[in-house]
């Protein structure tokens, strides 16, 4: 415990301690005068000098002091920004693969340039990871001036980037992008048909901004690339009508565990309704094996109705269900719940039910970022998750002192009996702040609550802005102006992370709006000066009013999210205030608070509208939050342990796939040998081979199924052992494939290698998709093994390994089957030959072609009967 306390709260707790960091900062400062005397060309040429030193044997640690000093001087010249000493400390922490906990407004964006520049000197690339496209684009353009001045290339990847743009960006020295784009590029690269079409170049060093959001909050959400699967979507609507007819006695809901299930009475009622609708066979039970799929429909419909709320967990936008991120409050467009839950929500909202998807490729952020050779991160809130950062990612969290002491006042919570009383008190508090022109940022946990508060403020005549997933387009502008005198901003958890709230307003953001219609440079300059002067006057007004006031309307499950909201106020020594208003009807206290506390509050005889402030209440709330945090950590640990098993298999499959892409030819001997061994073992039960019809006929039948040719029984008559049979079949397969290869020599060009590689890749992808689906099914029910006193994780490892061996064998068999049955038309058109040659260089020339469309080679056949055979 002592070591943990030192690690979390000792602000310079690394290496030799405080002196280690102070000494480095002192050495950097000592170089400042000399560097300031250099010309721009002399300063900016330091990069090539540093690379020469690295090539001569020096390390990045050796270059830390001069490199940081050069970056600071460059930032001063090109951006008029100079790194503070505490920012240098943050940069050192990042270089040493730590998490730098820096308060809001302390300049994390600028800090990242120090470690990114130093790391980029190796030439292997540095990835600076942000939470959204806006920040990635902004930071790459803003901080890119520093890197470019120093002769380094800077790239940016957003959701709209093309493959060509992505490949160019990954080749840059420093890349800014989001965690989602990086993760999906990794998955997409491992679905490509050629190395040339892959965009990523390796995993060297990642600096993760808002590291708690990416590595903690999103750790439970896997990255999934999916494709449609054939399943009756109409059933979701029919089952939805059935669930609507249920009464509270028919089901039980456990909000704490996010589960809903039928009671005994409910199961009987559902069974009768399903029978009357003809959805299950007469005489069968709801829980019979044959009805397990129908039970799945019912279960997901029940979850959709009883556990997921519109405007809290999701919104309906343009006829689609769009998921709301529970931690940021942002829309997660393009994301869909898996396992039929999204379809159940669409049926619940009476929307068009889209087809269900199956997983084509998946990974988790935990395993993705652990592939990097080096990783570090920045956030304003890391201390509460220090154990998890260390245990999962081997990252130490380090608190960086603020440049100026924090002046924000954090008031005690006010607790009310009902939610109605709480919101009335919140409105009264906002009105009082508004009277003295104190800007107020009101944090809510859902769209529904933010719009309720908006209605109440409108009735009181208070002008305000609302920032939630419905109105996210002007997020940066709204947050940037939330510090103007008398401004009232209602925001969900999204609250503009990455955008500072400047007291008095942000003149740059105001200028974008005010100057849009002015074309004269002189007028624009004069207007901008007016805006700067106005924001300075407004700042004085806000400071006199007490700075930005933060109002929390509910405690989040995680203390860290609450701290993030508080952290919007009091930036860089500004005054500020924060206060939370709670009620006994809030989800946290209702679901996780102890009954003892609730009983105690009721015994106090609180009157309507009366608030209570007591250390016991504060401690009870903190205990409830710790309880939820511990539960969520356990969930993430469990998910990681299971995904580690899948990740090992993912690495095996991706490595085998890359080996195929990296080699022009492939030796199929191992493949058909394993197929033949399995074939003979299934048919010949004894050590010795019996050429009787009972053994010979099944053997020949299997040979025909796999190789597509009739084998004469006489060929096997003189064989005596299983090994001899396998040996003969190996020779037979080798001869067959050599003949096939000869058939694929056309007009002097050998097309066999391309065709064989395409068969290998498509077959492996197909089997991996099926394997992922099987692993998902196994994982869903594996916890039931604990009833039999078995360790679910160990059982999962054993069965997953067995399934992998079976999958690889089926893959070998599929490849041999396809290669044996392939044909090449002798009168192939020039277009066909061109497409073969093009495909040998990378991406498929047939990508995007439906299997039932006519083949583009001009044969007139359907694609699936022509060149589509290479896509199977």
Curated annotation (Swiss-Prot):
It comes from the Bacteria. It is a peripheral membrane protein. Gene3D superfamilies: Helical scaffold and wing domains of SecA, P-loop containing nucleotide triphosphate hydrolases, SecA, preprotein cross-linking domain. Its cofactor is Zn(2+). It catalyses: ATP + H2O + cellular proteinSide 1 = ADP + phosphate + cellular proteinSide 2. ATP binds at residues 87, 105-109, 500. May bind 1 zinc ion per subunit. Keywords: ATP-binding, Cell inner membrane, Cell membrane, Cytoplasm, Membrane, Metal-binding, Nucleotide-binding, Protein transport, Translocase, Translocation, Transport, Zinc. It is found in: Cell inner membrane; Cytoplasm. SUPFAM superfamilies: Helical scaffold and wing domains of SecA, P-loop containing nucleoside triphosphate hydrolases, Pre-protein crosslinking domain of SecA. Disulfide bonds: none annotated. Its main location: membrane. GO terms for cellular component: cell envelope Sec protein transport complex; cytosol; plasma membrane. SMART domains: SecA_DEAD (SM00957), SecA_PP_bind (SM00958). PANTHER family: CHLOROPLAST PROTEIN-TRANSPORTING ATPASE (PTHR30612:SF0), SECA INNER MEMBRANE COMPONENT OF SEC PROTEIN SECRETION SYSTEM (PTHR30612). Belongs to the SecA family. HAMAP family: SecA (MF_01382). Monomer and homodimer. Part of the essential Sec protein translocation apparatus which comprises SecA, SecYEG and auxiliary proteins SecDF-YajC and YidC. This is Protein translocase subunit SecA. It comes from Anaplasma marginale (strain St. Maries). The gene is secA.
């Amino acid at each position: 415990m002592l070591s943990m306390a030192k690690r979390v709260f000792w602000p310079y707790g690394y290496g030799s301690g405080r002196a280690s960091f102070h000494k480095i900062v002192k050495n950097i400062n000592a170089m400042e005068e000399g560097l300031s005397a250099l010309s721009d060309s002399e300063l900016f040429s330091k990069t090539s000098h540093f690379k020469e030193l690295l090539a001569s044997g020096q390390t990045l640690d050796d270059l830390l002091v001069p490199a940081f000093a050069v970056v600071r001087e460059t930032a001063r010249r090109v951006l008029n920004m100079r790194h503070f000493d505490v920012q240098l400390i943050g940069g050192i922490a990042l270089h040493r693969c730590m998490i730098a906990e820096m308060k809001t407004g302390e300049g994390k964006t600028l800090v990242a340039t120090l470690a990114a520049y130093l790391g980029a000197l190796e030439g292997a690339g540095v990835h600076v990871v942000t939470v959204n496209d806006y920040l990635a684009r902004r930071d790459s353009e803003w901080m890119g001036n520093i890197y470019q001045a120093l002769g380094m290339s800077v790239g940016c990847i957003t959701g709209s980037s093309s493959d060509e743009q992505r490949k160019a960006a990954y080749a840059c020295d420093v890349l800014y992008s989001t965690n989602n784009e990086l993760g999906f590029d990794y998955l997409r690269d491992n679905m490509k048909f050629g190395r040339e079409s892959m965009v990523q170049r390796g995993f060297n060093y990642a600096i993760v901004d808002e590291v708690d959001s990416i590595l903690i909050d999103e750790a439970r959400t896997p990255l999934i690339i999916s494709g449609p699967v054939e399943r009756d979507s109409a059933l979701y609507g029919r089952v939805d009508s059935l669930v609507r007819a249920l009464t509270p006695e028919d089901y039980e809901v456990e909000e704490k565990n996010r589960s809903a299930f039928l009671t005994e009475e409910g199961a009987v009622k559902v069974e009768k309704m399903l029978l009357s609708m003809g959805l299950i066979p007469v005489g069968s039970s709801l829980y019979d094996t044959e009805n397990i799929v129908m039970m799945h429909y019912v279960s997901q419909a029940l979850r959709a109705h009883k556990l997921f709320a519109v405007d809290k967990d999701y919104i309906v936008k343009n006829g689609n269900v769009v998921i709301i991120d529970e931690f940021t409050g942002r829309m997660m467009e393009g994301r869909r719940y898996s396992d039929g839950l999204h379809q159940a929500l669409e049926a619940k909202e009476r929307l068009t039910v889209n087809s269900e998807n199956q997983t084509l490729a998946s990974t988790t952020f935990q395993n993705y970022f652990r592939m990097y050779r080096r990783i570090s991160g920045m956030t304003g809130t890391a201390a509460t998750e220090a154990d998890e950062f260390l245990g999962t990612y081997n990252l130490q969290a380090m608190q960086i002192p603020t440049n100026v002491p924090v002046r924000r006042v954090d008031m005690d919570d006010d607790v009310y009996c009902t939610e109605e009383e709480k919101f009335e008190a919140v409105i009264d508090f906002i009105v009082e702040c508004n009277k003295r022109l104190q800007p107020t940022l009101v944090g809510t946990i859902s769209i529904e609550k933010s719009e309720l508060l908006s209605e109440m403020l409108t009735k009181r005549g208070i002008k305000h802005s609302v920032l939630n997933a419905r109105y996210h387009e002007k997020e940066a502008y709204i947050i940037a102006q939330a510090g103007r005198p008398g401004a009232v901003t209602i925001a969900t958890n999204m609250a503009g992370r990455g955008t500072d709230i400047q007291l008095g307003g942000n003149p740059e953001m105001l200028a974008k709006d005010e100057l849009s219609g002015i074309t004269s440079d002189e007028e624009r300059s004069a207007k901008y000066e007016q805006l700067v002067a106005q924001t300075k006057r407004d700042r004085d007004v806000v400071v006199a009013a007490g700075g930005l006031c933060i109002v929390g309307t509910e405690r989040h499950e995680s203390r860290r999210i609450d701290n993030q909201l508080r952290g919007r106020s009091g930036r860089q020594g500004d005054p500020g205030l924060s206060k939370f208003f709670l009620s006994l009807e809030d989800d946290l206290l209702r679901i996780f608070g102890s009954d003892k506390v609730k009983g105690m509050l009721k015994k106090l005889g609180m009157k309507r509208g009366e608030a209570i402030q007591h250390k016991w209440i504060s401690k009870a709330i903190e205990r409830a939050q710790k309880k939820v945090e511990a539960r969520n950590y356990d969930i993430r640990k469990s998910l990681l342990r299971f995904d580690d098993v899948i990740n090992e298999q993912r690495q095996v499959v991706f490595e085998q796939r890359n080996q195929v892409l990296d080699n022009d030819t492939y030796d199929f001997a191992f493949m058909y040998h394993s197929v033949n061994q399995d074939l003979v073992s299934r048919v010949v039960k004894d050590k010795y081979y019996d050429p009787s019809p009972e053994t010979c006929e099944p053997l020949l039948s299997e040979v025909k199924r796999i190789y597509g040719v009739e084998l004469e029984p006489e060929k096997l008559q003189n064989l005596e052992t299983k090994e001899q049979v396998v040996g003969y079949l190996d020779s037979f397969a080798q001869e067959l494939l050599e003949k096939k290869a000869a058939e694929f020599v056309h007009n002097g060009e050998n097309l066999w290698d391309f065709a064989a590689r395409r068969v290998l890749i498509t077959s492996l992808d197909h089997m991996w998709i099926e394997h992922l689906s099987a692993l998902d099914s196994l994982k869903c029910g594996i916890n039931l093994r604990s009833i039999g006193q078995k360790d679910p994780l160990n059982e999962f490892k054993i069965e997953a390994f067995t399934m992998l061996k079976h999958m690889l064998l089926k893959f070998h068999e599929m490849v041999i089957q396809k290669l044996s049955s392939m044909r090449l038309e002798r009168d192939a058109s020039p277009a066909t030959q061109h497409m073969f040659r093009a495909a040998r260089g990378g991406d498929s020339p047939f990508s995007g072609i439906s299997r039932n469309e006519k083949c583009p080679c001009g044969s007139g056949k359907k694609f699936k009967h022509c060149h589509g055979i290479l896509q199977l």
